[in-house]
Amino acid sequence: MDQTSLILAIESSCDETSVAVIKNGDIILSNIIATQINSHQRFGGVVPEVASRHHIEQITICIEQALKQAEVRKEDLDAVAVTYGPGLVGALLVGVSAAKAFAFANELPLIPVNHMIGHIYAARFVKPIVFPALALLVSGGHTELVYMPTENEFKIIGETRDDAAGEAYDKVGRVMGLKYPAGKAIDELAHQGEDIFKFPRAMEHEDNFDFSFSGLKSAFINTVHHADQINEELSKKDLAASFQQSVIDVITAKTVRACEQLEIKQLILAGGVAANRGLRDTLDKELGEKFNHLDFVKAPLDLCGDNGAMIGAAGEMLMRHQVFADMTLNADPSLEFDWEPEAIK
């Protein structure tokens, strides 16, 4: 008889309070998400103190709703998984504190999950991850290529040297007068415009897998400011298309080069910006033309943003590898990706 595992998973690293119940690492029984976007829009970005207060208000409600929707009792659970970094320290502390209290009260093991590993493991809800694999993580705080030779081994082979792609989207969106978060709006505008501004593609042809988006951001801002000074009206659609094409060209070039140089069986696209239609379509086309053997797995659109389900998927894998934490677990806002799971025990 197959053994069943049930994990309560908690995510609170930024501006989403999310709790999920995950069965066997790849079946979602519930995935409650309390978003704070409306509270942060007027500030043009996430305010850490506001985020923390919202998490405090929502965390116990989300836990109760997740269990109720999953029709799972506390005594049915096998473990509690929680994001402990990277992220906003105050926000992380709410989730970590709640997870520790729940685990202690119900005598359950506690699984510490790196938020970025969670994003990668959202792919489990599409199909099993096959190793060796490469993950392209594109989000508000990270743009990374992560090589995974085997399960629970993570090696960053390329990362942004300045702004993350998602961060650049939000800053450019602010200049365009778009609401935060601006990624979806820019993507929609881009599909209606043309790449007429030919913004720079930083590091596109350099012999490495690193990214840089600060120069693109500056070029975009300078173009808009110059137009304002001479009372020239620029097309938002063309601005969005030009900006997005620059981002996509660089990300695609680096990813394709990595796939050519590494012997991998699967490429995973994950993170908030992984929901971008332009990026998904371009990678589909480029990879389809260049590789016959490569399995390209895109995280489900509704699981690209922060959510508890992905933490549960990663948590189940870590549980099988006996990665647990005790009640001294603390939030680590600057948690690095090149980590040694054994050191957490």
UniProtKB/Swiss-Prot annotation:
E.C. number(s) listed in UniProt: 2.3.1.234
Q: Name one GO biological process term.
A: tRNA threonylcarbamoyladenosine modification
Q: Which residues bind Fe cation?
A: 115, 119, 306
Q: Name one GO cellular component term.
A: cytoplasm
**Where is it localised?**
Cytoplasm
In this chain, substrate is annotated as bound at 137-141, 170, 183, 187, 276
Catalyses:
L-threonylcarbamoyladenylate + adenosine(37) in tRNA = N(6)-L-threonylcarbamoyladenosine(37) in tRNA + AMP + H(+)
Primary site of residence: cytoplasm
Q: GO MF annotations for this entry?
A: iron ion binding; N(6)-L-threonylcarbamoyladenine synthase activity
Pfam families, A to Z: TsaD (PF00814)
The UniProt keyword set, sorted, is: Acyltransferase, Cytoplasm, Iron, Metal-binding, Transferase, tRNA processing
Q: What class of enzyme is it?
A: transferase
Q: Which cysteines are joined by disulfide bonds?
A: none
Cofactor(s) of this protein: Fe(2+)
Question: Cytoplasm: is it a keyword of this entry?
Answer: yes
Q: Which domain of life is it from?
A: Bacteria
How the cofactor binds, per note? Binds 1 Fe(2+) ion per subunit.
Q: Known Gene3D superfamilies for this protein?
A: 3.30.420.40
In the UniProt record, does the keyword Ribosomal protein occur? no
Its function?
Required for the formation of a threonylcarbamoyl group on adenosine at position 37 (t(6)A37) in tRNAs that read codons beginning with adenine. Is involved in the transfer of the threonylcarbamoyl moiety of threonylcarbamoyl-AMP (TC-AMP) to the N6 group of A37, together with TsaE and TsaB. TsaD likely plays a direct catalytic role in this reaction.
Q: Which HAMAP family match?
A: TsaD
Q: Which family does it belong to?
A: Belongs to the KAE1 / TsaD family.
* Listed name of the protein: tRNA N6-adenosine threonylcarbamoyltransferase
Gene giving rise to this polypeptide: tsaD
